[in-house]
């Protein structure tokens, strides 16, 4: 049938083996050596807010938009409650009787979501428990061990799982609980990679890079614009808030070297600074910038987010962060430009020899700009890419890659279209975008 045909044509990365770190230690790949470029959508409340039909619709449209990872809050409460009124815990952290005959329980629904994601070629990056719950004392070390064993046993054979410890929390706090959770999962599940989702404007690499259970690093560049401070004790240097490429450079300078990505940049449609609805909203041009900046700086992929999608706003339900489910429910937000433009970044990176790629800012000749005027370059042996957000004139050192003559194109992050500029000698060459 046509339906069966379309399902069979879905690309499933795990058909190339388990997800793992490449031998260069900077990127991800499947076991047979096929490159895996992480392109994530933020679906935090997917397990709690959506029913079966809605979850299937969401995951299918994520696939159509090019996403191959969805980040979820596995539980956002102790207990969490889902669309069907089912709780994630019915006997605390004792999961012995969690599967009840004749009851479509919380974890049955989670199973369904993971299976639907599998059918769409999507990994579920499971933030096991949101960090605020641990900070407020809702899970101790022994409970973390029990929960980790439960998760590991239940999902060790699912091909499309990525474990995420933490959850918008500081990597140097509650460490014994996070360690217990991570190690109890790995005691029963050696099939999946693991990482840590940190607090805003922090990186897991700062405190966890040496941990054996950490296969890759995440940072959360956060939602603030340049110079925007909340007065919450944030120690980040003011004036650099949007420079998410800096987190990549810092992580890739560490030993041991591990892949890294921005797991939470500014969301499309969310107020700048997050909490004040009167502030301007981040737009598609902004979410594109964070993607290209961090990937060209050397990250192994990128996660996108949308204000109305991550909380799955529906008409008649209260929303946070200045979002309105009547004005724009989650399914309408999936039509927004940023959601549908991120695939052009993934397509671009997978076009070229993948594992040889390095960030190289010496490609930019002369003085580079600051803030939005900063160009960022990455290259392989015979190709180079420069992202120039502001479109200012720039000089590019074409000697950095092989060949006496260089063919040059403009590439549009809005639609993935190429425009041929011409062929140039191998030397420092000025370019000015005239589009």
PLM feature spans:
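Active-site mouth of glycoside hydrolases
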Residues: 11-228, 233-243
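Extracytoplasmic
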Residues: 7-27, 31-34, 43-45, 405, ...
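Catalytic-core region of carbohydrate-active enzymes that cleave or remodel glycosidic bonds
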Residues: 190, 211-316
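Short, electropositive alpha-helical surface patch
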Residues: 124-125, 142-151, 279-281, 318-332
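Short beta-strand segments
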Residues: 164-166, 195-198, 218, 261-264, ...
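Aromatic- and carboxylate-lined catalytic core of secreted/periplasmic carbohydrate-active enzymes
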Residues: 34, 256-260, 267-271, 283-422, ...
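Tryptophan-centric aromatic hotspots in well-structured domains and transmembrane helices
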Residues: 4, 110, 410-411
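Bacterial Sec-dependent N-terminal signal peptides
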Residues: 1-7
